[in-house]
Amino acid sequence: MRVLLAALGLLFLGALRAFPQDRPFEDTCHGNPSHYYDKAVRRCCYRCPMGLFPTQQCPQRPTDCRKQCEPDYYLDEADRCTACVTCSRDDLVEKTPCAWNSSRVCECRPGMFCSTSAVNSCARCFFHSVCPAGMIVKFPGTAQKNTVCEPASPGVSPACASPENCKEPSSGTIPQAKPTPVSPATSSASTMPVRGGTRLAQEAASKLTRAPDSPSSVGRPSSDPGLSPTQPCPEGSGDCRKQCEPDYYLDEAGRCTACVSCSRDDLVEKTPCAWNSSRTCECRPGMICATSATNSCARCVPYPICAAETVTKPQDMAEKDTTFEAPPLGTQPDCNPTPENGEAPASTSPTQSLLVDSQASKTLPIPTSAPVALSSTGKPVLDAGPVLFWVILVLVVVVGSSAFLLCHRRACRKRIRQKLHLCYPVQTSQPKLELVDSRPRRSSTQLRSGASVTEPVAEERGLMSQPLMETCHSVGAAYLESLPLQDASPAGGPSSPRDLPEPRVSTEHTNNKIEKIYIMKADTVIVGTVKAELPEGRGLAGPAEPELEEELEADHTPHYPEQETEPPLGSCSDVMLSVEEEGKEDPLPTAASGK
């Protein structure tokens, strides 16, 4: 029993963990149009109005949104877009690129200093002065200050650029404030480009920062003279390099160049400033570089807000001088639909890119048979089991109901068609009734004498044809009553429209021949005769009087035999067929006694 309770408890905990835990926070954001739910940070974020750009990934208040300025413009403290200064003059170089919240900073090019400063630039630049004879350089010239000279010490060689570099006395030379030329043999070893490797440059810089007054280095040549600045400077030697001020480095042209600054809030230092390489800056974590600059980034923007199924594509920024254009207003960078573990930083080295690729290739595939959802971190999360159960149940109910309604509709349609076929059968074309009697009218003497002179053709034409098909009882009776009876007119004279054909008077049940057969159904056959009753005391032998003709006309309706069995319900349209015997001769009417 305890094992069963423990298993039920584990199942309950698994069901609780399968459901998303941040749904209450997500529901609170839906009702507020000024906020939206960020699945990456799992909290509500402020939606910046149109024309403003968020300064962080999930802004919380209107102050976290800033105005979007055009390129080469920055947003000043008064929240206005101001143009950045230009460094288009020949004596100016760019020190700090133009950013979204700071202007571009220009300074005098190497070998010159600024005599008249301006805001973020210099109005007038002059060349560094040269120390006169007997003077050596105390402080080399910078972009802001001129060269400072001092009298040479007795034990210092005037060929060296600084008294800290050389201690050997020499004479007959004039101190100069210009950089010492570097020999080609040592230039490749002393001046190392940044692209070759940052680690080697840092190691070289650490070797060159030894104290110049160290007893182990004074007067002792180094094994690698090109990388050792502490060796003595012999007379006329060109192995001594120029010593730059702090925050300056010696470029490939042998000039001291200012290192870039990472003082902005959205930048961090990636590589420090060395004697032969500049400082390298990159965007802080959570931001990407939209506009790059030399050894830095001009504009950093937050990571785009992607859906739960997508993550941000890592951008390959291993090369420094690669130029990236800013995305248009209102758009976000691309999102990769393929989930990856973690987000790549804004700038990665080739070694880190290879490691990321190897880790991505070793990721195990996720089976697609089970319902899987991707969280903001890219890890698969199984959906709740009851959701799949309810979906299958709803599908089964819908399919079953549709099949039942379809079958029921077909059955009802079949029944309705059967009822319509019984009540409204297909009407067959009935032949036109042509009642023509060519027999001459019989005289009263012939009727009295009982002479029977008849013709078969006249008897066949003198009778009215009965309808071949009757639908309902009322329809058949009305149709028979509507048929007019015509009597044969004597030869040579026109027949009156009110002349009636002579009815056939049969003997009282002496004729056993079948005159007509009424077929009601396939299993019901009724045999009977048609009777024409005459008034008592009257015969057909007398003269045709008007009263007799009216009585015969009024009483000419034939009487059909009644059906003995009651028809079933719904058989109102039973078909009755009248079949007459062929070749049957009508018996002659008997003579009526005259009064």
From Swiss-Prot:
Intrachain disulfide bonds: 29-44, 45-58, 48-65, 69-81, 84-98, 87-106, 108-122, 131-149, 233-240, 244-256, 259-273, 262-281, 283-297, 289-300
Highest taxon listed in the record's lineage: Eukaryota
Keyword terms, alphabetized: Cell membrane, Cytoplasm, Disulfide bond, Glycoprotein, Membrane, Phosphoprotein, Receptor, Repeat, Signal, Transmembrane, Transmembrane helix
Cleavable signal peptide: 1-18
Region (Disordered): 167-238, 323-355, 438-457, 485-509, 536-595
Entry-linked Pfam families: TNFR_c6
Extracellular side: 19-385
Entry-listed glycosylation sites: 32, 101, 276, 336
CDD domains per UniProt: TNFRSF8
Residue positions where Phosphoserine is found in the record: 438, 452
SMART domains on file: TNFR
Chain ranges passing through the membrane: 386-406
TNFR-Cys repeats: 28-66, 68-106, 107-150, 205-241, 243-281, 282-325
One GO location term (cellular component): nucleoplasm
BP GO annotations: cellular response to mechanical stimulus; negative regulation of cell population proliferation; positive regulation of apoptotic process; positive regulation of TRAIL production; positive regulation of tumor necrosis factor production; signal transduction
GO molecular function: protease binding; transmembrane signaling receptor activity
Alphabetical list of InterPro entries matching this protein: TNFR/NGFR_Cys_rich_reg (IPR001368), TNFR_8 (IPR020416), TNFR_superfamily_member_8 (IPR052862), TNFRSF8_N (IPR034002)
Basic and acidic residues bias: start-end ranges: 499-509
UniProt miscellaneous comment: Most specific Hodgkin disease associated antigen.
Family: Belongs to the TNFR8 family.
Function: Receptor for TNFSF8/CD30L. May play a role in the regulation of cellular growth and transformation of activated lymphoblasts. Regulates gene expression through activation of NF-kappa-B.
PANTHER family membership: TUMOR NECROSIS FACTOR RECEPTOR SUPERFAMILY MEMBER 8 (PTHR47497:SF1)
Protein name from the UniProt record: Tumor necrosis factor receptor superfamily member 8
